[in-house]
Amino acid sequence: MSLSRKLLVIFFTWITALSMSKPIFVSSDNMNFTFKSFTIRNLTFLGDSHLRNGVVGLTRELGVPDTSSGTVIYNNPIRFYDPDSNTTASFSTHFSFTVQNLNPDPTSAGDGLAFFLSHDNDTLGSPGGYLGLVNSSQPMKNRFVAIEFDTKLDPHFNDPNGNHIGLDVDSLNSISTSDPLLSSQIDLKSGKSITSWIDYKNDLRLLNVFLSYTDPVTTTKKPEKPLLSVNIDLSPFLNGEMYVGFSGSTEGSTEIHLIENWSFKTSGFLPVRSKSNHLHNVSDSSVVNDDPVVIPSKKRRHRHNLAIGLGISCPVLICLALFVFGYFTLKKWKSVKAEKELKTELITGLREFSYKELYTATKGFHSSRVIGRGAFGNVYRAMFVSSGTISAVKRSRHNSTEGKTEFLAELSIIACLRHKNLVQLQGWCNEKGELLLVYEFMPNGSLDKILYQESQTGAVALDWSHRLNIAIGLASALSYLHHECEQQVVHRDIKTSNIMLDINFNARLGDFGLARLTEHDKSPVSTLTAGTMGYLAPEYLQYGTATEKTDAFSYGVVILEVACGRRPIDKEPESQKTVNLVDWVWRLHSEGRVLEAVDERLKGEFDEEMMKKLLLVGLKCAHPDSNERPSMRRVLQILNNEIEPSPVPKMKPTLSFSCGLSLDDIVSEDEEGDSIVYVVS
């Protein structure tokens, strides 16, 4: 539909609406979401909160006394107040949680968890009795409404006992409390799953909290009688948009706090009447006219309303048309300008191919010519009859102007890169609404196909010298990207399927679709976490900050793959138990048997000292603490025997940042495919 036709439709719709005698109603949106189990999507994790097997943990899971606090928040703010109708929303939520003490000593219990509503989505509260809700140094900074599930008696906050629920408003001194053990025989820290329902009805100014042990077989029934019922007007506190979530804490205890599922909804926004011919006031039940009005005949009323509609609509519609025309014209001009600028950048040193030439060379982009799939499109084998050469052509999946501009921007990175261990860009084409990039052809394909094809055929295509050469070549490419380019290039997607092998089995790093440019010695910016599970550094998953250290982690996983002939995440043939490659090699290292990790297909034909060095470099690069990982320049020096490697601890260290994720937690989400993108705050 053309723009002019769209504007006409808008125009006549507007006229029809204005000519009707009834006023128009507009309603505010109510919110509704449900998590039957959790993923990292749509949630923000602060402090020690973490995700394991679809369950949110709020505090560290340690068998020794520890101090911890964590918060998980629904990413999107929720509207609780509608200024047009001056209405505060009602809300209902229910969730299942478990509180369990890992130590049988009852003195090591505490402190509990809370469901909260707050304007703040980035402050981590203090541990202990503060329940991760507020900072002990600034207790009045964070305003909130919360239902606490307290498992420790804290006289500082006037707690009645060590097993109670309470309503907290801007303070941890509860307005009202109830002991579920006395009224419902529910022990909050029993280790059993408990389901809670929290209902606030704004029209009744009433908040009810229900509690029941979760039924493991059938749907848990909501109790008829609330455990806590408070007559309170929350409208002064539920103003504007707020965030909802959970927090939990410990202080010198071994208590864990798990959230298993969660649903939340708002309701009760009243409809708002738009302005009509007559002034009126909106109440809960009726409309009262300020002055008596003589109602004209139906025909006169219709003509009168139509005249008003035309008088109002015509000037507005003209302005709207001019605005829309100007907006799209400016947008088109900016995209064309940006594309021309990027096109000029790419022209330097590169050949511009015609679309017809590439179409013919790939047999019309026939599926039989597909040799790979990258972050932004399919890769085709192209045979140029006139020159007798073979190239690889990448075809972008993004057909929009924005998509092509973004793709050109990404490729401007690799267009200026020159290194023997990088796949070289030969040329490009931008015709018929498509963006095509031409790379040198790698006859031996990708590393993963060679590495894992062997296990099926029994033939070993990669001997020890090839594998060592691949590790050194990849380190050389990354050292160039991280330290020798004018701007530092962080690849963000290093994996065996993105490492190509030339005719002599030399490693060539390709697919820069996720790469980012940064200034040297500048702090990186958090972005969408992107890449492939099993290769992602733990701090990258947690904070979304990609650096040369996250690339180093991926490199460590890759060279362990090369040395061991095993995938990053694999299953034992007999038990079908998931095995993490880094953890497996580290366990063998701790037992003094690290060489037992070597690919059996090599049949012992390798340099033991150098192989051990390669395995230990892999572990050092995959160290959970990013500060302990060597730079790629140092890795290259170690593998070239120019310097000695630094020692690798016998036991795999725990993560040093505040989130309590283990590497198993990080990779356990990879059930449906290779590449996963998460939104991380």
Curated annotation (Swiss-Prot):
Per the UniProt topology annotation, the Cytoplasmic ranges are: 327-681
Q: Which CDD domains match?
A: lectin_legume_LecRK_Arcelin_ConA, STKc_IRAK
Q: Where is the active site?
A: D493 (proton acceptor)
Residues linked to a glycan = N32, N42, N86, N121, N135, N261, N281
GO CC terms on record? Answer: plasma membrane
Tell me where in or outside the cell this protein is found: Cell membrane
- What ranges does the record give for the region Legume-lectin like, renumbered to this chain? 30-265
Q: Which InterPro entries match?
A: ConA-like_dom_sf (IPR013320), Kinase-like_dom_sf (IPR011009), L-type_Lectin-RKs (IPR050528), Legume_lectin_dom (IPR001220), Prot_kinase_dom (IPR000719), Protein_kinase_ATP_BS (IPR017441), Ser/Thr_kinase_AS (IPR008271)
So what EC number does this one have?
Answer: 2.7.11.1
Keywords per UniProt: ATP-binding, Cell membrane, Glycoprotein, Kinase, Lectin, Membrane, Nucleotide-binding, Plant defense, Receptor, Serine/threonine-protein kinase, Signal, Transferase, Transmembrane, Transmembrane helix
Reaction catalysed by this chain? L-seryl-[protein] + ATP = O-phospho-L-seryl-[protein] + ADP + H(+); L-threonyl-[protein] + ATP = O-phospho-L-threonyl-[protein] + ADP + H(+)
What is this protein called in UniProt? Probable L-type lectin-domain containing receptor kinase S.7
Identify the coding gene.
Answer: LECRKS7
